[in-house]
Structure formats: structure tokens, C-alpha cells
Amino acid sequence: MKKLLLGSFLVFSSLMSAQLFLQLENTRIGVIGGPNYSRVRNAHNPSYPRYSFYGGLLALIPLDYENQFYIQPQVEYLSSGEKGEGSTLYANNYISVPIYFKGYFTEGRDSFFAFAGPRFAFLINQKVQNPASPLYVKDKIGKARGFDFALSGGLGYSINRKFEILARYDFGLSSVYPDLVESWSGDPNVYRKKSQHILSAGVSYIFGE
């Protein structure tokens, strides 16, 4: 029994070591960025989408020897939020850390791919310009939460496993403005979650082979 357990442990350790070596040896680094369209539901009234951008770095960590499945963590600057009428702006800027499971549809150099995973975002600054109400400013009930969580996923196409184009959607699960629940506004959505939703396009370039 002891020999069986020892043998099983050695086999498991060997497999884990091989997997770790594969991941470290073949991890590739890249850059990513593009435009985005963001809205915050049930928050400011009136509310319109904001068009902005994101950009950062990624790591492509292999999970198999066929170069088809990966973990892809990213670190990005993400500019999002919403707009109001005229020059009214409610901008939230984050350091965003999505962690994707990524799968290519084929083993070929050119291939469609899909990705999905959690996205963690940490607020670095907030800009409120010409708010529709004096209470919407960040020093009062309009202050944005310092952490935003979302589920993120999308589709893309890879050219030679280097240059990639993609589209993704972030479905917010956090309430961006937790204090924005004042009934004086007359808005029936005022007590609902102020979740952020972001639709993005992007391009990435992955270095190495």
C-alpha cells in the first residue's frame, strides 16, 4: 500500500512538474487595446453611453501541448462610465485585471478563438463634469465604489497566433454607485443595482512563437 501511494505521488509530482515547466517555458507576453462603449444601469438620470478606450499587457499561458487552450491574464487601464446630456460626464477609470480561459477552435496558426472569465477592476480616479444634480458629485452620493467585479467574455480571430482582433462584453455584477439611492430623484430605478456594462473591440499582438 505504501509503495502504491509513493508511486502515485511520484507520478502526480512528475505530471505537475511537467505542466509547470510547459507553462513557464512557453508563456508569451503581448499588448492589447481598443475602444469601448460603456453604460451604468439605473444610475444617473438622464444617462447615455460613454465611448472611451482600454489598453495594457497580457500573458498567454499554455494549458496543453497542442497549443489550443490557455489561461490569459491581463493588466489594463480601463476608462469607462457614462454620459448625460450635453457636456455632462460621469467617468470612472480603473486598473482592470481580467483572467480568461482562452480556447482556439483549431490547432492551426490562423484560427477563431473564444475566451471567458472574471474581471477585477480597481478605481484609480473618478471625474464628474456638469452633473445633472449637485448630489451626483463624487464627494456626495455620486462617489463610485473602489472595486468593480464583472464577468467578461468574447470572440476573436488570430492571424499566425500573433496578431489578433477581438470583441468582448463585460457584464457588471457590482453596484458602481452604492450610495446613489435617494428617492428624491423620482427615478423608479433608484434602488436597483447600478451595474456597469462594457462592450469593447480590440487588437492584440503577442510576442514570441
Model regions and ranges:
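Residues that define the transmembrane beta-barrel architecture of outer-membrane proteins
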Residues: E25-T27, S47-F53, A91-V97, R145-L151, ...
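Transmembrane beta-barrel domains of outer membrane proteins
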Residues: F21, L58-P62, Y100-Y104, G154-S158, ...
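Membrane-embedded beta-strand positions of outer-membrane beta-barrel proteins
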Residues: I29-G33, I71-V75, I99, A114-A116, ...
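Transmembrane beta-strands of outer-membrane beta-barrel pores
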Residues: P35-R39, I61, Y77-G81, N93, ...
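Outer-membrane beta-barrel "beta-signal"
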Residues: K193-E209
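Glycine- and aromatic-enriched membrane insertion/assembly motifs of diderm outer-membrane
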Residues: L24-G30, N36-R39, P46-A91
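Repeated loop/turn-to-beta-strand initiation elements of outer-membrane beta-barrel proteins
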Residues: E66-F69, R109, R161-I165
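Outer-membrane beta-barrel translocator domains and adjoining extracellular loop/strand segments
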Residues: R41-P46, K83-T88, Q126-P134, Y177-W184
